[in-house]
């Protein structure tokens, strides 16, 4: 305790001595010492140093090398001690900072004149940062690569302090972190560094024509500098197969090149059977020089070197077929495939089969249907029409109620329903169901049929007659045919050249594994029809058919004659108006032109009894006119030296002169010496007289005389033995022709103007 008090007293005395103003000197000390700093090249750095009670000389050292004691630090232009002596501030200012300034600095004060001890500050490290140079990619601006073959891209950034940080970014803006190798190499000055980053890239099609960039930066400058390179990637074709729909139809099921128009079919849609299908193969490749090949179920298609393939008639055999398109270029080959989904109508792959079963046994009927989409199958029992199943297989226990006929019906939307039937037969003894009385014709071949339902199938069928079994040894008169029918058997006994003694009662016996059945069948003779009656009947039928044929032919010919002729041909017409005058135009040659007979109607109004008719028949047409009067007839006929022209009748009313002009045909009746009448037609021409009435000038045509016995002879109008009588046919007897028979009626280019027709030649 005493020792402690002594120590405290000693310390107090020492403190009082140091703080006393009467002390002979005071120690110098640092009020502020320099600290470690970091600066970028070109920046300004100040290392602080303040000294209290400075007695000695102050200087800065750089890596233990003294810089000088004066404030301007001569010899070091970028260095200076800033501050004031009064404040004891001797801070070191460096501007601009250079890489050489990267060192350890210390502020030192030498001992004072009165023996004050020297003092030194702590070392302060100045770290100088240098931004890196712009990065460079050693491969240049473009690198050529092949898909899936690795390449290396190197990015170098030089002169950074610290070494530059390098970041890789792909063409999509994604930062790459994998498959990168980063190394730092010091420069010879051992202060700066070269940073190198190698990107090991596996090129893909997506990288084609994209830019990869590397970014370099360090703590001296956080603004990155970058370099980029464009990647040209050669890649194998990228293939896509599309199924295109087309119009229904197409024949032959052939596979060929490009087809017609089509519609893109979405995935999952079905192709209708028998339609035309076009498949398109799209390929993206670099280089683009490619070769196409098509396959169906790995079988190459001949001529399939195009971008499209057409199946002209797609059938159900193409359902689920794999259509593959293979495309190849210099880099490699690739492929794509599409599975065809064909919609087709249902068809039976396996029809239900009839079965034989015992009561209580279990049977299974199978109905396999091929269709797309899958069919709806329904089993129906007949005759109840009750649905008993809806699956491919129908299994049930056999009984009297379940035995019978079953229908399998398959339905697919958009297609016709199909059905098939099968029988389930109960096994038992046979039962004969034939007619008990059958007939034959004496002298002809007779047949007796014995039908028996037999499940299982009959193993023996026999015939007996008058107690004796009929067999192959019974003579050549008999033969037996046995045919299997659904659910039974049919036996036919054939009797050749049957006679009366062959007719009678026959027994048919059917035997199977479950029993037998016997039926007695009566064979009766039916009366034959006599040969004479057969012949008479046949002749009657033939005669009736012959008469009927003749009547039909006559009816058809008569019906054809009643048909109207064409509009420009007048084959026959009659004119009967107040005098019984009739005319008939007969062609001398069937190839003649009927249109030479023309009817011209001038104006739109024809008064009653006034006819405007113009005939100009060719020579080969003969016009025969007959006029009945007092039991005699006059026949007028022109030959090809004369023309019969019935000119247009014109009626003009003039209010001042009250004149009327009428052109009428003239008829000359000639009495021959033989008592017959001959006539001539005189073509008339209008000659106006002073009194306003027209006179007629005529040309005489040749006349054909008609003798009482009906013969005709050509007569000359100049014969001395004839007497000519002039008879003017009144206008009421003028010929009337339906204007629709005119060629002008149907052809406006043949219609003439209102000018008058040329007059006929004047008679001499």
From Swiss-Prot:
Region of interest (Disordered), ranges: 640-660, 691-719
Cytoplasmic side: 557-764
Alphabetized UniProt keyword annotations: Cell adhesion, Disulfide bond, Glycoprotein, Immunoglobulin domain, Membrane, Repeat, Signal, Transmembrane, Transmembrane helix
BP-aspect Gene Ontology terms: cell-cell adhesion; cell-cell adhesion via plasma-membrane adhesion molecules; chaeta morphogenesis; compound eye development; compound eye morphogenesis; compound eye photoreceptor cell differentiation; compound eye retinal cell programmed cell death; homophilic cell adhesion via plasma membrane adhesion molecules
Single GO cellular component term: cell-cell junction
Source species, domain of life: Eukaryota
Nuclease found in the keyword field: no
Glycosylation sites: 211, 313, 393, 400, 507
Signal peptide, first to last residue: 1-19
Annotated transmembrane regions: 534-556
Biased composition range(s): Polar residues: 692-701
Location of this chain's protein in the cell: Membrane
Domain Ig-like C2-type, residue spans: 21-120, 132-230, 237-343, 346-419, 430-530
Phenotype upon changing residue 16 to I: In strain: Mz10, Mz16 and Mz36
Biased composition range(s): Low complexity: 702-719
Summary of the tissues where the protein is detected: Postembryonic expression is strong in the developing optic lobe and in the eye imaginal disk.
Disulphide-bridged cysteine pairs: 49-107, 155-214, 281-325, 367-408, 450-508
GO molecular function: cell adhesion molecule binding; identical protein binding; PDZ domain binding
SUPFAM superfamilies: Immunoglobulin
Keyword Transport belongs to the record: no
Extracellular side: 20-533
Main location: membrane
Topology versus the membrane: Single-pass type I membrane protein
Name of this chain's protein: Irregular chiasm C-roughest protein
Organism field: Drosophila melanogaster (Fruit fly)
Underlying gene: rst
């Amino acid at each position: 305790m005493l020792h402690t008090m002594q120590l405290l007293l000693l310390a107090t005395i020492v403190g009082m001595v140091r703080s006393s103003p009467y002390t002979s000197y005071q120690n110098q000390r640092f009020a502020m010492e320099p600290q470690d700093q970091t600066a970028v090249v070109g920046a300004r750095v100040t290392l602080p140093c303040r000294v209290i009670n400075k007695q000695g000389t102050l200087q800065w050292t750089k890596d233990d090398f003294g810089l000088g004691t004066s404030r301007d630090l001569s010899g070091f232009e970028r260095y200076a001690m800033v501050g004031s002596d009064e404040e004891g501030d001797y801070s070191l200012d460096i501007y601009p900072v250079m890489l050489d300034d990267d060192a350890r600095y210390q502020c030192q004060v030498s001992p004072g004149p009165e023996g004050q001890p020297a003092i030194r500050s702590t070392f302060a490290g100045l770290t100088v940062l240098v931004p890196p140079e712009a990065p460079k990619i050693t491969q240049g601006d473009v690198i050529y690569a092949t898909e899936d073959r690795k390449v290396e891209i190197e990015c170098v950034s030089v002169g950074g302090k610290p070494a530059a940080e390098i970041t890789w970014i792909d063409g999509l803006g994604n930062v790459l972190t994998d498959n990168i190798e980063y190394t730092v190499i010091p420069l010879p000055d051992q202060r700066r560094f070269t940073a190198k980053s190698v990107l090991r890239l596996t090129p893909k099609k997506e990288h084609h024509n994209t830019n990869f960039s590397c970014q370099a930066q360090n703590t001296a400058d956080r603004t990155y500098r970058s370099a980029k390179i464009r990647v040209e990637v050669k890649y194998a074709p990228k293939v896509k197969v599309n199924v295109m729909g087309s119009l229904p139809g197409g024949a032959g099921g052939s596979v060929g090149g490009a087809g017609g128009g089509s519609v893109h079919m979405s995935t999952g849609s079905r192709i209708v059977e028998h339609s035309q299908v076009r498949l398109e193969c799209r390929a993206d490749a670099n280089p683009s020089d490619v070769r196409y090949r098509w396959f169906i179920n790995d079988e190459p298609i001949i001529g399939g070197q195009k971008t499209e393939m057409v199946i002209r008639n797609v059938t159900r055999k193409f359902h689920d077929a794999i259509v593959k398109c293979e495309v190849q270029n210099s880099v490699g080959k690739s492929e794509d495939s599409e599975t065809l989904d064909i919609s087709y109508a249902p068809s039976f792959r396996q029809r239900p089969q009839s079965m034989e079963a015992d009561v209580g046994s279990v049977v299974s009927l199978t109905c396999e249907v091929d269709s797309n989409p899958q069919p709806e199958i329904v089993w129906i029992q007949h005759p109840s029409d009750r649905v008993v199943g809806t699956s491919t297989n129908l299994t049930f226990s056999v009984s009297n109620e379940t035995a019978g006929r079953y229908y399998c019906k398959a339905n697919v939307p958009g297609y016709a329903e199909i059905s098939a039937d099968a029988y389930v037969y109960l096994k038992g003894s046979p039962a004969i169901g034939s007619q008990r009385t059958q007939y034959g014709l004496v002298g002809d071949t007779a047949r007796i049929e014995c039908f028996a339902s037999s499940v299982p199938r009959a193993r023996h069928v026999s015939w007996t007659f008058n107690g004796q079994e009929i067999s192959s040894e019974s003579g050549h008169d008999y033969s037996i045919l046995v045919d299997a029918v659904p659910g039974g058997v049919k036996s036919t006994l054939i009797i050749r050249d049957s006679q009366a003694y062959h007719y009678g009662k026959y027994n048919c016996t059917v035997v199977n594994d479950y029993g037998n059945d016997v039926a007695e069948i009566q064979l009766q003779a039916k009366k034959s029809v006599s040969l004479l009656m057969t012949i008479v009947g046949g002749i009657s039928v033939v005669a009736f058919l012959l008469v009927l044929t003749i009547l039909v032919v006559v009816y058809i010919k008569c019906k054809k004659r009643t048909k109207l002729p064409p509009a420009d041909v007048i084959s026959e017409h009659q004119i009967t108006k107040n005098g019984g005058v009739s005319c008939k135009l007969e062609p001398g040659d069937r190839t003649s032109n009927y249109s030479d007979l023309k009817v011209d109607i001038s104006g739109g109004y024809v008064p009653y009894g006034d006819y405007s008719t113009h005939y100009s028949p060719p020579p080969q047409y003969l016009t025969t006119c007959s006029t009945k009067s007092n039991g005699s007839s006059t026949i007028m006929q022109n030959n090809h030296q004369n023309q019969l022209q019935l000119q247009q009748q014109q009626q003009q009313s003039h209010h001042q002169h009250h004149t009327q002009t009428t052109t009428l045909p003239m008829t000359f009746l000639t009495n021959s010496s033989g008592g017959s009448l001959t006539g001539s037609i005189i073509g008339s021409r209008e000659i106006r007289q002073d009194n306003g009435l027209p006179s007629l000038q005529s040309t005489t045509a040749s006349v054909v005389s008609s003798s009482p016995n009906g013969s005709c002879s050509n007569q000359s109008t100049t014969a001395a033995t004839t007497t000519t009588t002039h008879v003017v046919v009144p206008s009421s007897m003028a010929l009337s022709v339906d204007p629709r028979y005119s060629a002008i009626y149907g052809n406006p280019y043949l219609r003439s103007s209102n000018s008058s027709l040329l007059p006929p030649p004047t008679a001499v």
